């Protein structure tokens, strides 16, 4: 497949994600998908991950800022926003709704095989995300180092 075709698959996936169309994942994600970021395998566990995220952040949206493809890999940078209005499981701990709006930049790397996402990695600033939710706070020393964030 060409780089443009691979980018089109990723765009369709993010569009399906933003529209909460998990059924379309069946056409876009390999049954034996490997999710390195969340250490899981398989399409169904991948879909379950998103279903749980949608419960915690029903308005979560990812806007593509940049997308690059080479060979069978696609890199995409998204600006994600959402409001924590539902219960969300955070590392095995249930986090009740905070009502806080969050935003974060995320980079995904996907390997495409047979016109589907076959393998994926994710890079984001989880520390800042947790700070925005109010789950963690700076220490007094941290507040002095980063007063604009404290």
Residue ranges and their predicted role:
Residues 1-150:
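C-terminal and inter-domain tail/linker signature
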